[in-house]
Amino acid sequence: PELPEVETVRRGLAEHLVGRTIRKVEVLHPRAARRHVGGDLDLIGRLRNKSVTGVRRRGKYLWLDVADARDRAAVVVHLGMSGQMLIARAGAPDHTHLRIRASLDDGNELRFVDQRTFGGWHVDDYVEPEDTVAQSLSLIHI
């Protein structure tokens, strides 16, 4: 997906994810978590029982801000060429190319579907959002 499509995905995810808690994560294809330094089991552990506090976009990457009482982090998602982030009811039939499933506290699931497996998820340190408006105003004289 190109940048406008990634922004559309971000907006849709924000409506469904902010305020939700991730109860369980399943990595169904190892390539989907290949960029996570600790491997898929570490990714699962880092996300369990985390609340989604924000959904941001940095270039073509989606950043799902997550936190609990001890830790703040971000799920960094790259959609690759064919990746999709879908919201589905728990128990709905799985898509053929389902790679990661995150069960949410409201009975829905966040599903990462990627036919070509070029995309993926990794957990990274939380980074404060940049104040792009202030930056733009400071550069206006140029």
Give, region by region, the residue ranges found by the protein language model.
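Extended, highly charged segments
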Residues: 1-58, 63-65, 69-72, 101-103
